[in-house]
Design a protein with these regions (language model features):
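Acidic/aromatic-lined carbohydrate-recognition and catalytic surfaces
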Residues: 1-188
Length: 188
């Protein structure tokens, strides 16, 4: 069975790993299906294609369910309600991404405000276990977004060629954006 999560019906303009995904998994179990084939679950790049990704390892943050963030206390009911997009036969990528990006940023801030104990331990362990790709990815995304996601070879030459001083400066300049990207991958 080939179904990408973005194809699930949902109220947020694009399918995600929320209730509709759970319903689909239940359906697969009830019908004794043993394989669920998906397109890549990585962040989409140009043209919103899952085959044009910025990473082979990262998860697409737009698959994070606002309803699950509500359950975790990272979004309020009114905030998730404001994300609702009237149903359509096509995905309104730009509108869905715009609304979800703002909500994910807010949820991330709440996550960091309350971070401590076991959750902090799990978060730090996640960063350590995935550091071989995650550290470069979060920096790339933070710098990339500041460059309107233009190709990296059009960025400032020092950061594009990974000069140590430019990397250090970028880590300070984009500290908040980097924190957001770490959380997005942890939450995914």
């Amino acid at each position: 069975t080939l179904v990408h999560p973005t194809s699930f019906p949902g109220k947020y303009g694009i399918g995600d790993f929320g209730q509709e995904a759970r319903i689909f998994l239940d359906f697969l179990e009830e019908t004794e299906q043993s394989i669920w084939q998906v397109l890549p679950l990585t962040p989409t790049g140009y043209g919103n294609s899952p085959y044009a990704s910025y990473s082979a390892f990262a998860g697409n943050p737009y698959l994070i369910s606002p309803d699950i963030l509500l359950e975790k206390g990272l979004l309020t009911a009114s905030e998730t309600h404001s994300l609702i997009i009237p149903s359509s036969t096509t995905v309104a990528y730009e509108l869905a991404f715009e609304k979800k990006a703002a909500a994910l940023k807010l949820a991330s801030a709440r996550f960091y405000e309350t971070l401590g104990g076991d959750e902090e331990e799990k978060f730090e362990r996640f960063k350590l276990e995935h550091g071989h790709w995650l550290d470069d990815y979060v920096l790339f995304m933070a710098v990339g977004k500041s460059n309107q996601m233009r190709p990296w070879n059009t960025w400032d030459a020092d950061i594009a060629t990974r000069k140590k001083s430019a990397i250090s400066k970028a880590k300070k300049t984009y500290e908040q954006e980097i924190k957001l990207e770490y959380w997005l991958q942890y939450e995914f």
